[in-house]
Amino acid sequence: MTDKRDLVILGGGLVGMTLALAAARAGITSHVVDKATPEELTVEGVDGRASAISTASWNLFCNIGLKDRLDPLGCPISAIAVTDGMKPGRIDFEPKPGDGTLGRMYANRDIRIALFEAARAEPAIAWSS
């Protein structure tokens, strides 16, 4: 029997899995293909980076069902300073009182785990490696 899907996604990283979950929310089935398994992609130490998640990206994560998984893990970005080490000067960004934060910081591993947990619970998403 052949499992027919609407969409093939090459790469099960942050972008690919976000797309798969967003597509599932819209009723689109997908098959994610990656050279590694979800377990390999979430093992501790495989990706020590962190990502700054903008408010717009956070809203997307909330809409695809990641809020409860990610909310307790990140830390708010309350100010941003932009500098160029080779030149004088800087630009500072701070939200006005009541505007909330400028975004949130998350370990990439935490985002991946949340994405894979949500995808495992979603029958519209298939995976192969």
Please state what every model-predicted region is.
Residues 5-32:
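N-terminal Rossmann-like FAD-binding beta1-loop-alpha1 element of flavoenzymes
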